[in-house]
């Protein structure tokens, strides 16, 4: 039934597991994907959307490296919006509303095209370990499957408990069993675990809603694909809608707080700070008269709509009564109730920066098992874990993205060195080099790395080369040619004209000289926007590049593996404990560890220089 030994076994078929399995198999590893239900591969367990603030950037990065989340998103997209357009370009973040069923179907089809990727529907309950090295897995039916490496991407399934009011039952997702025993086995080996909580909103029958009482939220045109390989042709986008809760909603929920597992003590673990339940919002912000609710279609051929902003674990009848008080929902029919789920995770400080565990060789963790929340964060970790599992078993150097290279680098660096005690989600504010890490330049930052790894297709290389050629040609044209600006009554170089804050690229392309050049050379709008951005933000970009060089200097000060921090008497006790625990490879890594102060770093540098 199974080959003698797989190169990589991926446990879990969500966003993280799917990316991990494809990355490993695309790099040549004979891979087995084990999941509890093959029909639920690539499920959107919560809202049917991809991208958003900082998350859209990560999808672009996954795509630039040769991952698939961007391609799948484009194939299932039913609405596109570019968020934060009123702010600077570092903040622009693409977001797509997706067809939930098509998204999952496309993942399954994509995975099944790989000849060296096999599938098995079962539950992994134990690992086979020899001399602190993983050599396989054991399933719930007692089947042993050997492998050179294992990637755990268990999502919310480890000892998952679902809460709806007073009712609670074991489950990793509604109507799906949780995974029991694996956490306990890992703890027995020496890992430590924690508990986290997340939740989802009710789904309603769209035919029962009065959309005339809501605010239409249309998609943006033109639609911009997430993948650099996609050519989108979506003629009609689905509408989303906005409505609001009110004091009647809040009063009804407040009276039933004692029936919420969040308030009555049944759920004791921490949920996502930036995605609280509706009852938490009403409680925390008692002075607010309303809260925004987004009504999002679940797909093209379904009546279901997702009620974004109304995540809840209240009893079903309370959820329903509260929903009826919202404008447009007066005659709503509930298709599925919202629920909360608590689950086990393993603090990510137990990992190396290639996502391999420090304790067990060739064992990798990715996704919510590491304390993150969100499809995009999970997919990014899966891609990196899949790459590094392949590299490790082939005795190659690990693939590690730096903080100045990608949001994915920021994500993993934060997890490894700072850890998390609440579900971690990515924001642009977490990246200190966010002007460099824009959504428009992910291919320029990362595709060459994907080429070196062997993940990037010829089509992708060809597209990037063509883009760079056109960009260089256009920039040179702007640099050497002058334009007669009738408004300013000046004849100046196009670059200088564009550097003025009151002049946009759209003003420039109206000039006949430039219009003819663009038409003749078939210059894409995105290239023009990138050149404009570089010219207008040149000072900021150069400053960030200088900051990167300063940080790089800290990274070059290496710390020996056997370095004894007890020798350094002047650093704080907390810093010494953290450094002994994390064992950073460089001063740069040490500086990012929570509890290690700039003063500790200065003392450490002086000590290393003297040595």
Curated annotation (Swiss-Prot):
GO biological process: tRNA methylation; tRNA wobble uridine modification
Binding partners and assembly: Homodimer. Heterotetramer of two MnmE and two MnmG subunits.
Protein name, per record: tRNA uridine 5-carboxymethylaminomethyl modification enzyme MnmG
Gene name linked to the record: mnmG
CC terms in the record's Gene Ontology section: cytosol
Coiled coil: none
Cofactor(s) needed by this chain: FAD
Residues at which NAD(+) binds: 271-285
Molecular function terms from GO: flavin adenine dinucleotide binding
NCBIfam families in the record: mnmG_gidA (TIGR00136)
HAMAP family, A to Z: MnmG_GidA
UniProt keyword list: Cytoplasm, FAD, Flavoprotein, NAD, tRNA processing
The keyword Cytoplasm appears for this protein: yes
Record: residues binding FAD: 12-17
Organism field: Karelsulcia muelleri (strain GWSS)
KW Flavoprotein (keyword) present: yes
